[in-house]
Swiss-Prot record:
Pathway: Amino-acid degradation; L-arginine degradation via ADI pathway. Its EC number is 2.7.2.2. GO terms for cellular component: cytosol. Signal peptide: none annotated. Belongs to the carbamate kinase family. CDD domains: AAK_CK. PANTHER family: CARBAMATE KINASE, CARBAMATE KINASE-RELATED. The keyword Nucleotide-binding applies. InterPro entries: AceGlu_kinase-like_sf (IPR036393), Asp/Glu/Uridylate_kinase (IPR001048), Carb_kinase (IPR003964). It catalyses: hydrogencarbonate + NH4(+) + ATP = carbamoyl phosphate + ADP + H2O + H(+). This is Carbamate kinase. Its main location: cytoplasm.
Amino acid sequence: MRVVIALGGNALLKRGEPMTAEVQRQNIKIAAEAIAPIAAEHQIVVTHGNGPQVGLLALQGSAYKPEEAYPLDILGAETEGMIGYMLEQELGNVLPFEVPLATILTMVEVDGNDPGFQNPTKFVGPVYDASEAGELHQQKGWVFKQDGNKWRRVVASPIPRRIFELRPIQWLLDKGAVVICAGGGGIPTMYERGKERTLIGVEAVIDKDLCSALLARDIEADLLILATDAEAVFTGWGTPERKAIFKTNPRRLGEFSFPAGSMGPKVEAACHFVNATGRVAAIGALADIPAMVRAERGTIISSSFSDITWHVEVPIPGPASRPV
């Protein structure tokens, strides 16, 4: 079976943790241990978030003069190399030596007329209090939006249209490699207006879940797993009536609304993939990845399900909850 596993930002850096290399390495080690059992039996592609990392590099780059600072597309490429290296190393420490690993810098085409450029929504970088965010807005012109009780920088997040490195990814998979690619949604690029053969970088960050769904569709994956810090997709989140969805179809899932900055993009990406391919998507906790492959944990989304079944209790990492 061919599986795309999209690691949420929590797989690399949990909220409130310092953005140090050692902290990220420890989190990536946990992710590698969850992925390894799947890689031993299936063809695996791993994608990952990079919001905190690309934001940190942008903050470091602010020491440059504005005209000398590196743009977001280059910072995104840097994070793909950095995180890909750490994932390769930790996966290599738990997989058999003969399993090849490869990280691919992945350029992704976007449309210069995408409405996302007019309404920045993608969180990048660390959290700030209101006064710090205000100062940075005045100094650098950055746009901020509230994220919980803090503030974070937001940038444009255009829809991914095409993955340029698709063929090399497929070649490596066919040779048995575990492929790490499309980190942070890939490097946003487009053809320069009036120059059909000139590819240029774009100051934006692509949603990694939507890019993972596009990748999974194009490589004909059997399963798309979106790993996050929640054990399943919940209705009534934050209320006493919250319930965890076990199995459902895209139509029924579309009847609910989910937060735009967290679960919303994952649900949208999962439904896109299922509707486009007729295959299966799963959303759940990082530790539950092996159980999601077996359709025992998380929220499993398939057009073959006629309605919704619920986890009897809030699922926690471990044996699957019994469905209603």
